[in-house]
Amino acid sequence: MLRTMLHAKIHRATVTRADLHYVGSITLDLDLMEAADILPGELVAVADINNGNRLETYVIAGERGSGVVGINGAAARLVHPGDLVIIMSYVQLPDAEARRHHPRVVFVDAENRIIGTGTDPAEPLPGSGLLSGHHT
């Protein structure tokens, strides 16, 4: 049996542009992609914190150090510049490996610069003021 597990999460990135007339996808700063171990062409889910919209698309590598998080194509009707998003990729693993798996979590600032990393997708960056998913 294979289990679908969170592989990587870029948490609270700021959308820098949205272009309806682009071929499609999400463009990500190459620094963010490498920190999260997300490859060009990889399937990702995008959750918009501002409006609750969720979508799936594939990744295009953006300029390293640019901070770009660009929403392209039809998704530009759902996600807008300035919105905060969570970008997630998943991996399918055999049961035994899934039980040992730890995802990569990348925290960014308002300019999409990396300010921290972790392996617990429910744990916020210390000092961020966000609540842990472990507490109810």
UniProtKB/Swiss-Prot annotation:
Functionally, this protein is described as follows: Catalyzes the pyruvoyl-dependent decarboxylation of aspartate to produce beta-alanine.
| Entry cofactors | pyruvate
Q: In which pathway does it act?
A: Cofactor biosynthesis; (R)-pantothenate biosynthesis; beta-alanine from L-aspartate: step 1/1
Q: Where is the active site?
A: S25 (schiff-base intermediate with substrate), Y58 (proton donor)
Molecular function (GO) terms listed? aspartate 1-decarboxylase activity
Subunit details for this protein?
Answer: Heterooctamer of four alpha and four beta subunits.
The free-text note explaining how the cofactor binds reads:
Binds 1 pyruvoyl group covalently per subunit.
Which keywords does UniProt give here?
Autocatalytic cleavage, Cytoplasm, Decarboxylase, Lyase, Pantothenate biosynthesis, Pyruvate, Schiff base, Zymogen
Q: Which PANTHER family match?
A: ASPARTATE 1-DECARBOXYLASE (PTHR21012:SF0)
Q: Which gene encodes it?
A: panD
Q: Posttranslational modification, per the record?
A: Is synthesized initially as an inactive proenzyme, which is activated by self-cleavage at a specific serine bond to produce a beta-subunit with a hydroxyl group at its C-terminus and an alpha-subunit with a pyruvoyl group at its N-terminus.
Q: Which InterPro entries match?
A: Asp_de-COase-like_dom_sf, Asp_decarbox
Q: So what family is this one in?
A: Belongs to the PanD family.
Q: What EC number(s) does this enzyme carry?
A: 4.1.1.11
Q: Which domain of life is it from?
A: Bacteria
| Main subcellular location of this protein, as a coarse class | cytoplasm
**A Gene Ontology biological process term:** alanine biosynthetic process
Detail which positions bind substrate: T57, G73, A74, A75
What chemistry does it catalyse, as a reaction equation? L-aspartate + H(+) = beta-alanine + CO2
Give its localization. Cytoplasm
- Protein source organism: Acidothermus cellulolyticus (strain ATCC 43068 / DSM 8971 / 11B)
Q: Which residues carry this modification: Pyruvic acid (Ser)?
A: S25
Protein name, per record: Aspartate 1-decarboxylase
Record-level GO cellular component terms: cytosol
